[in-house]
Amino acid sequence: MNFHHGWTFHKLRKNEHFLKYSAIFYSLLKPVVALFACQCLVLIRPLARKIGSFPFLILTFHTLFYPIQNTVGAQFEVIGQSLMGTAVGVTWGIITKLFATAANRNHGDGSPILATSLALASFISAYIRSRYGYRFFCIIWIFIDCFLLTRDPFEKTIAKSFYISLVYPSLIAAGVVSLVTILVPPMRMASDLVGQSGLDHLNKIMQSLNFSVENFFPSDESVSFSSSSSVIKRMFKEHESVLRNSMDDFHTAISSSEIELNYSNVSVSTLKLLEPKFERITLAMSAQLAASFTLYETYNFSIYKNQDKEVEGDIRVSELRFSLPESTEVQQKRNIFTPQYQLHINGSLRAKVRPKDSKDRIVNLSNLYFSNVDHMSSLILGSLKLAHAIMKWLVSDVEHIPDERLRECIESLQEIDSKEENLMTEIFCTAFKETKKVNDFGGFEEIEDEEEVLVIAYYLFNLFEVAREVKNLLLLLEGLKAQRHNKPKLFFRKFNLSLFDKQKYANYAISALLTHFTAGDADKCDDEAPDDASGEEDDSPKVLNDQSFFDSVRYPLKFFLRKMRRKCWRVYHFTARSKDVRYGLKMAIGIGLLSIVAFQKSTAARYTLWNGQWSLISTLFVLEVTVSTTLRVGLFRTLGTLSGAVYAYAAWEVSQGWSYAIATLTFAISWVSCYVKYNTEYSGIATVFNITFPPILYGSYLKTSTISPFHLACIRFIVVNVGIGMAIVVNIVVFPYLARRVLKYKLGQASLLSLKQYTTLSDYLLSRNLYTNLTICEGYKKQISSLLVTARKLLQLVNMEFNLKGPFPVGIYNDLIIKLENLGIRLVVLNRVRSRFGLYLYYDVVKNMIDYRKDLIVSMTLTFYILYNSIMSKAPIPYFVPSCRQALWNLRLAIEEEGKRRFVTNGGILAQGAGSDGVAKDVPENHSWLPAQKNFFLYYVECQVIGDIVTDLEYSISLVRRINGEKENETIGKKMA
């Protein structure tokens, strides 16, 4: 029996390895076949003679400008851009060459015309590439001009090979790649890529749901707070990272299908409708994971405080949710600021010891509501599996899901949604029954005793949110089922992928922070205010009282000079601030400096003999936006050039010029190079390798070079490194664009957007119309996510820069990126919670508590601004920071006092006419407070989310302080001494 089980396990592992290797084989089949087809075409000598002097450029065009893409539509988009770049580059080169040859025939010098035209083309193409994209179009344009304009700049006539030497290789490579894309399996359509990415994302959501349910309540054996909490916290971070990465993969799949060339049962534009639903489910699932970890922390904290002795040592606020102040006097102090050390060490946590039966209470409560959690999670998991099956049916030919089963699942989720209010009321009734002072509202006096109940309720609330979003997904899939065709059809369209209209919401200003004086001061300074507060000068002339002749001459001249100064300021401001202009100037200067050798009479012949165009091409592909990217790409290009040159010389010596041996060797190495290019992070090395050995190996085979392969390989390596060195020098000297600086800028912009997002939510809360816009808030979150994605990429490049200020804190920056992303997510969750506020709750916990609300809003807004200012300008963190946690507690205790005032002790009846503005008159007579606990529970959920935001804010500020090099604050004892 053991042998049988062992054999079965070995067979399963063997099948897994076979499936893995077969998937890699099929993924490499297309690029290898395309590369081998281009190699065979180059080896045909009659065809090579007709192509011109550079037949090996077929391989260069294929590798650089026609790479195999994931989908057919993306492949034809690349081919279209490259062909357009070929047309523009050849046209630009021909026109420039006509002017240069005309100057040479008329006893002039046409080389300055060629040099100027090449620099101008470099600037325009680099600017378009940096600002608008179209990467393949821009690169192939300047690539062709680098070859055409540096060949014999002093000739007086244009040879016929000038027109076709680069056009034929481009067309041949495009044709080969097009045929391979269509004919060689597997042929992936856009719907296949998007559908598979969506199915993978649903699998990740189901895994996260299983994890949160399995860890809904830990076992009794896990009594260690530090070890078990750290392990569980790491697991939660891993699941959050997996969810984020799978959602990013789905976004990438949608983006790669911008031009849809699709032959399937459903269009990509139909599948794109799933994107907002997936985002909301991911958001709800992230909140559910956070609630699960909160529940786990509460359980461990109840064990941690279940002891007779007070706990000594530092307690991190980030490990806990709320803590009571030491006394009622401290509670009622509405201090806006608190010292820095209270962000980390909170002595009030030792003020009260947890009740000894807290562990038993939370065990009993979890057992009481575990059946609800088990039923809901099972239904949600079954619904996600059903959504997975329906989506799989949309993109492939599998068994159809009956509509009755889908409707039954939707009705079950709807029934669960309708039971939310009753279950929340039951939970709070349980909390009040556990207290000894129900009638005088004493349950809120011992809020620590009820923390377990509230945390379990918070967990259930987020589970209800997940169920609601899954129900919306099923409703959408029910509508999308009608969009599926019984037979595959051809879809071809281009749809807009803009996620957020930046201009629409660009006018949202933070007047409370940007205004440095009050309204009264503004009235006093009205007459002394400048003409234009934005920094630009006014074009309109002043009304003059003096009408003399000198004034009539002087003031128009002054106005004209002021206007010209303003235009010059705008040009300078645009040049200095625009990343696109800076990149274009760097590209033009780099290529212009290297092309000087090609346009000098004394060095032009040697330049062509040395194959010096490759130094220009190296500058083209190495000179990136940031210095660190230039160093990284330059290193990859050096390694790729070295390996390609060594391989070309070795292959020539082994093959001895035999075409079949050359084809065999190149076909074998194609598998290795394509694997490195498409399945590893060293794709830059493989790309340069594929364009390095053809000029050396095939040049010797076709007798296009008069020098030996060894010398050609050495010269190629030297000129490429000359281009790399020039690119590095230009990028450092001309507008240095450092990854560290850009990284800090991106993080500062993300924190500023978080500030705008919170101020927008505060405006909604304090407005009278109870208006909450989910679109604007989620749009801010998408912008934050986009900035943080760029920050993650830059974080991988900072170590490539010249390190003059010591080691770069990569780990701290990574933690800061995670916290900023969590802030964006939790602000969206806060907006979604507030969107459920009704009129009763609004007047009860918002309008009557407006002063406490303003304290909390001011404290959090100032904290957000301190975070933004410290990141952007490296400003030191003030010793006294806004006391967000204290303001939050003051608000909670104020709500408690309001509840006491409105509660009648005889029978627990809500008083009629109580409260301000006659709000309670709208409440029905004999309406108990307990059935209305849904309102209070939404308030608790809001406070819980705000508490998480405060925790992330405090931790982010501590990270920024460490990044800025500020010293850690001393302990309380040293401060008191």
UniProtKB/Swiss-Prot annotation:
BP GO terms, sorted: malate transport
Organism: Schizosaccharomyces pombe (strain 972 / ATCC 24843)
Record's keyword terms, sorted: Glycoprotein, Membrane, Transmembrane, Transmembrane helix
Pfam families, sorted: ALMT (PF11744), ArAE_2_N (PF10337)
Name under which the protein is recorded: Uncharacterized protein C26F1.08c
Transmembrane segments: 24-44, 54-74, 83-103, 108-128, 164-184, 376-396, 585-605, 616-636, 656-676, 682-702, 717-737, 857-877
Membrane topology: Multi-pass membrane protein
Classification via InterPro entries: ALMT, ArAE_2_N, Brefeldin_A-sensitivity_4, IVT-Associated
Glycosylated residue positions: N210, N262, N265, N300, N346, N364, N496, N773, N926, N969
Keyword Membrane: yes
Location(s), subcellular: Membrane
Principal location: membrane
